[in-house]
């Protein structure tokens, strides 16, 4: 991949590289990226193995506006004509994360949002953790805590369930939760707030980690924002405290601007 990209950036001779992608529906897409001195194209063929035979589902050619191979190993490319509801850019990772970074990403970071609440976009610690509390974050936190999707009861979440999860996951108090997360004393419940999805937001991945003497782990998290063409839009130091029973608590966050402006959360 590096030699193909180097040939492209140096204006070298015609070159191509073939990539195979396994899709969620068990189909396989062959993508051939072709460069010559006048244009870049991607030729694709998608097929699925059924009844002991391969059946072609789709085939075509797309012109590309540009492509980029980052130092960390992301291949990011832009179509010349963006289809309706499509992303500005497409991407995949050429150089994989280490097994430990992938494990830490899945356990502590996967599913957290940079745009739906401010947990990852402001600095906070035990002294001001209540600043990150908003009702809509519970969906994601519950999923990380239980491994299951939340099923609210008639638009409300029982206080015992809500507080058990949030007190386990953050250094906050019941009073702070009830003051900030739409608690209803008559129902002894918290109102369920649906997150309005935002297209193609950045996502975080753990690229390094430090095991601290106090038992906490400081995760170095880079934000990948493909639509901005960046695999290090900003960098977080997210500190967590693992417990012996397998649960954990988020203890603090520090964010640093790198290649892109940090999103500003507004409810």
Predicted region positions:
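Mature, Sec-exported extracytoplasmic domains of Gram-positive
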Residues: 1-267
